Amino acid sequence: MVFMAFNGEEKGMLGSSAISTDKNLNKIYSNMTALFNFEMVATESAFGKNALFMTGDEFSDLDELFNKNAANGLKINPDPYAAQQLFYRSDNVSFVKKKIIAHSFSTVDMTKATHYHNESDDIHIVDFDNLTQIINNFGKTLEKLSPSNFNPKYNDTVKF
């Protein structure tokens, strides 16, 4: 398991582009099964608590494989904002270009998110109980995954 942090998304994926093209990390990338990019997971989703949506769900089977093994009712839902092409507009795309299964996971309800890209984005909007539940259940789900039950693939509709 690899944890990465990068910045500069709003300036053109600067951080994720830099780390995804770092040749010193190629051995890690060649052994990577999937990349989970968490983005705006501090609020309750339109699907309720303990639920996220995955961008680009139509491009791979990652969500189906994950949901088959999900712990404690955690649910990955299809992207309700697919028309906005968030899959190609977030840091995961730097890894998609390397043909690594990479999707963003979010809880943001764009119909209610008045703080999105605004100064009003503040700690008071965070639903800590829901965030903790999602993190804990995501971790418990990852513990259940192995090469025998988790080998996600892109389909032929994704644009590398």
Q: What feature does the model see in each segment?
A:
Residues 1, 107, 112-160:
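His/Asp/Glu-rich mid-to-C-terminal helical/loop segments that flank catalytic regions of hydrolases
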Residues 7-109:
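Metal-dependent peptidase/peptidase-like ectodomains
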